[in-house]
Amino acid sequence: MKRRLDLSRKRLFLFDLDGVFYRGKERPVKIGGTRIVKKLRSHQKKLLLLTNNSTDSVKTVHSRLLALGIPIRNEEILTSGLLTAEYLSRKYGKVSYYLVGEPGLEAEMRRFGHERTVGEEADFVVIGLDRRLSYEKLDHAARLVRNGSKMVATHVSRLYMYKNGPALATGPIVKALEYATGERATVIGKPYPEMFRMALRRAGCTARDALMVGDQVETDIAGAARAGIDAVLVATGVDRSIRGTRALAMVSNVDDLVEYL
């Protein structure tokens, strides 16, 4: 990265997690993060972590980061599950929902008082990654949507990195339901702008104040650009080039950013 990059005027730093601070979830391997977090704190900068991961609760993510020695506060973690639950609460109040997802997403929905149902009526079908998805569950969700339930998806990423390489993410599930019902889901996570808007609102900052740091062009960099936010790519995850993107720069490791504050 060239020295002319100056991040000193940025007030809010947004970070992706997997591929930026660590790799993997069950046995995460730390990439970096401790130095940049401490530096941002010493400069009185704000930071938030934005992850499309909906399978883990905020509590689980927080415990993982602390175990890796990264001094993050619970309220600085914004998962797609948390923001989906918050979005529904802010716009509709407490809702009933049918879950296509895992316990981490259900935990965030419960925090906001939303009521899970397995019956024939639901205000919403809430969709996250579901690694135990069955035909029966998918068919039931589609039937609910055809009967008037609305769909909201945590994100629509195609793949995520798992133990043995790329695995199907939430996107294929969402697309299957959209195809089966002819309806479109509201999407919260990256690269859609809702996650970025909610982060800016929470921090009390404008898009110009913020910088997004991520490892994926398709979600982190493109999503930030769509929201009017500058971005930097880290070369420790999925992508290794910023050619053809609107990223300001690429760094070898997230902790390299301390040189540009």
Predicted regions and their residues:
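Conserved phosphate/oxyanion-binding catalytic-loop motifs
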Residues: 53
